[in-house]
Amino acid sequence: MYREKFTKITEGFTFDDVLLIPMRTAVEPKNVVVSSRISRHIQVKVPIVSSPMDTVTEDAMAIAMARYGAIGVIHRNQPREKEVEMVKRVKREETIIIRDVYTISPETPIEVARTLMATRNIAGLPVVKDDKLVGIVTKRDLEFVKKGSSVSDVMVRDVITAPENVDIDEAIEILHKNRIEKLPLVDSSGHLVGLITAKDIITRQKFPDASRDSEGQLMVGAAVGPFDLDRAVEVEKAGADFIVVDTAHADNENVLSSLKKMRKQISVDIVAGNIATAQAAEDLISCDVDGLRVGIGPGSICTTRIVAGVGVPQLTAISDVAEAAKDSGIPVIADGGIRYSGDIVKAIAAGADAVMLGSMLAGTEESPGQEMIINGRKYKAYRGMGSIGALTTGLSDRYSKLGNGFIAEGVEGAVPYRGRVDEVLFQLVGGLRTGMGYVGAATIEDLKRNGKFVRITNNGLRESHPHDIRLISEPPNYQISNISP
């Protein structure tokens, strides 16, 4: 019995254990298609998801990710109301027709109008009385106005409008012809039913590959705890395109039971994790989830494998889960352990449909981590969601709690500042395209199906990195600090 535990032991592989074998190919990197699914019904043009960590993804990151063609998941280590508001901000950031329009009444004092525009970061407000459009007021209208004035004193009353079924080309023509920036949409009774802005149209044209829903809004995911059905309902109502049920060990009887209940209440896609085995994949699939999140302990800030002695090397975990899920058509997201763009190529070749990133995005301008200067270099705070800091600020249901204390499964630290997230994504996608070109994969499915691995030795790994030279500068897609000790 005990001896068999070692005589029948299996072998696990991770990113530094293997390389992909180059193939004869006619595929050029610039021509490959990197679009993929991150859940049953969510397709993105860039197969990268920002992790729902409180030092990685809030609304600014989610907006930047979606604009690039990737997607972000808002973290849940905050009050429900704040997460809901972040989801709403992402959904409002870009849209052809704004349905949930901020409005104001004619009697509103000018000071209140100014405050509302500033807090909502908007330049104008439709003026509504008895649910009917009676005017519009902009920041420009509020300049040099005497105190004590009301909106009715300065608003534009002769408002140019369009019917609610106007098409986008006609709306652009109306905006251009009348030299206006906002076009209210009204029904036959004069009720305000929507708003089209020139800013949103220009932004849409600027980001043609953005991840958008059927209404033209940016797509976003929201993380919820496995037992927080109320939060799941609220973020779905706010517009979340999919939900990530966020727990360290999803193959747990209580979690599985809760997932089945959540499935009955939630209509958007549900991505569940984290898991690391084929059996776990089968268990989650039986709960009718729409995506699988793979990775127990591979992250740079995770100590689960050391503290608990549990985990599966990430490439083996990915391949085992992907094998179990392949007939179901449910996508697999590889979460954790990725340090270079080449690791993304390996993860997909092992069976993943997309990857989830934490540390590689934590140092970007859009991440919410605190900035700091260490030895003259700029860094941003980054911590695991199993760190004491994260656990004590609210995320106690993701990891173990024994008695009155927490069992930490993560650490807190800092990562080098890396600039804007679009610059990082450009390098990562470029590496993915290059890798696909080497192995002759024109699509993500080709890479999953045809990628072949060779196992390498420690000497092979050393040979793979720059050697026999003193580096005097780091290229944007290679950091010396990422090399394993």
From Swiss-Prot:
Catalytic activity field: IMP + NAD(+) + H2O = XMP + NADH + H(+)
Activity regulation info: Mycophenolic acid (MPA) is a non-competitive inhibitor that prevents formation of the closed enzyme conformation by binding to the same site as the amobile flap. In contrast, mizoribine monophosphate (MZP) is a competitive inhibitor that induces the closed conformation. MPA is a potent inhibitor of mammalian IMPDHs but a poor inhibitor of the bacterial enzymes. MZP is a more potent inhibitor of bacterial IMPDH.
Alphabetically ordered keywords of this record: CBS domain, GMP biosynthesis, Metal-binding, NAD, Oxidoreductase, Potassium, Purine biosynthesis, Repeat
Record-listed IMP binding positions: 300, 335-337, 358-359, 382-386, 409
Assigned EC number: 1.1.1.205
Active site: 302, 398
Cofactor field: K(+)
Gene Ontology BP terms: GMP biosynthetic process; GTP biosynthetic process
Annotated positions binding K(+): 297, 299, 302, 463-465
Keyword Hydrolase listed: no
Molecular function per GO: IMP dehydrogenase activity; metal ion binding; nucleotide binding
CDD domains on file: CBS_pair_IMPDH (cd04601), IMPDH (cd00381)
Top enzyme class: oxidoreductase
Keyword Metal-binding: yes
Pathway: Purine metabolism; XMP biosynthesis via de novo pathway; XMP from IMP: step 1/1
Positions of NAD(+) binding: 246, 295-297
InterPro entries to which the protein is assigned, alphabetical: Aldolase_TIM, CBS_dom, CBS_dom_sf, IMP_DH, IMP_DH/GMP_Rdtase_CS, IMP_DH_GMPRt
Residue stretches making up the CBS domain: 97-154, 155-211
Physiological role: Catalyzes the conversion of inosine 5'-phosphate (IMP) to xanthosine 5'-phosphate (XMP), the first committed and rate-limiting step in the de novo synthesis of guanine nucleotides, and therefore plays an important role in the regulation of cell growth.
Family the entry assigns: Belongs to the IMPDH/GMPR family.
SUBUNIT field: Homotetramer.
Record's protein name: Inosine-5'-monophosphate dehydrogenase
Organism: Thermoplasma acidophilum (strain ATCC 25905 / DSM 1728 / JCM 9062 / NBRC 15155 / AMRC-C165)
